[in-house]
Amino acid sequence: RPDQLSAALRERILETAASMGYAGPDPVARSLATRHSAAVGFMLGQGLSASFADAALSIVLDGLASTVDGHDHCLVLMPGRDRGGPRPETVTRAQADVVVAYSLPDDAPALTAVRARGLPLVVIDQPVLPDTARVEVDDFGGARLAASSLWGMGHRRFGVVTFALHPDGHNGLVTPARLASTSFRVTRDRLHGYLDVTGTDTPVWECARSSRELGRAGARSLLTSNPRPTALLCASDELAFGALQAVRDLGLRVPTDVSIIGFDDVPAAEHADPPLTTVRQPLAEKGRHAGELALRLLDGGRPGEPTRLPV
């Protein structure tokens, strides 16, 4: 109880502790005694290396970290492993007072583990869960805006390059049945936004993750089909960067031969060659809102209505 000590006595105690190499109470023991860890768990849908290569995720994470750090909380990262999310035992062992889930599939087992522990939960993007705090953007509206822009330019032959519909590692063309049963709300909404303008017969290439390498392969496959699309709608900027490379691989030019639109507006978009046209979503703001919701739940607040940010 340092408040009951004189300043001089407190200073002597601290000097003695420092000379003995005592750094203070053991954090694990302290958390057991107080039943609080001052930590926010962050559940990822993929491994750490893939996550840190995702520019959009990095910006969201920065917004979240800056918010909780300002209230003396730390972040505990729980990388995805099985079926698009952390293993349940990872969640069970994690020292966290509240959990933020980032883009997990609807049936991620990690979500059941969070509920079993009775921890407050905040969702960024997906899944949609009842009575759960959530931050999202208008994915359908943003995708529809992108497709409408290209339609207004006169394009009628489209191709779509998207990230995963299911956490099963599939790369290839999407069948109507696979589209109808997708496990990811964001993927579903963006595809519905695109196809609402271009038509349900538009070819859609699925990439197992949002990466330039897979976007390049998917775009190349679409651009070598007959008839060749004159416009590609990419569900992320990372996929769009890969599509730009595929266009160069085939000796084509943007926008003379093919138009490309991404989604995210990461900083690298304006430095691409040519600069990438993209749908902007407020990534840092999304992370900050999630952090504010997590802190509110820790203070006993209610989840409230989902927060939808404009694109």
Label every model-predicted segment.
Residues 1-36:
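N-terminal helix-turn-helix DNA-binding module of bacterial transcription factors
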Residues 16, 63-67, 113, 189-197, ...:
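Alpha-helical structural signal in soluble globular domains
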Residues 20, 93, 153-155, 222-228:
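Glycine-rich phosphate-binding loop signature in dinucleotide/nucleotide-binding domains
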Residues 35, 39-152:
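Alpha-helical recognition/docking segments in bacterial nutrient-uptake
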Residues 46-59, 79-85, 135-144, 161-218, ...:
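Hinge/beta->alpha junction and helix N-cap segments in small-molecule ligand-binding domains
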Residues 107-112, 116-118, 152-155, 159-167, ...:
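A charged, well-structured terminal subsegment
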Residues 156-157, 201-202, 254-260:
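Short acidic capping loops at alpha-helix termini that bridge into adjacent secondary structure
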Residues 216, 220-311:
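Flexible loop/turn connectors
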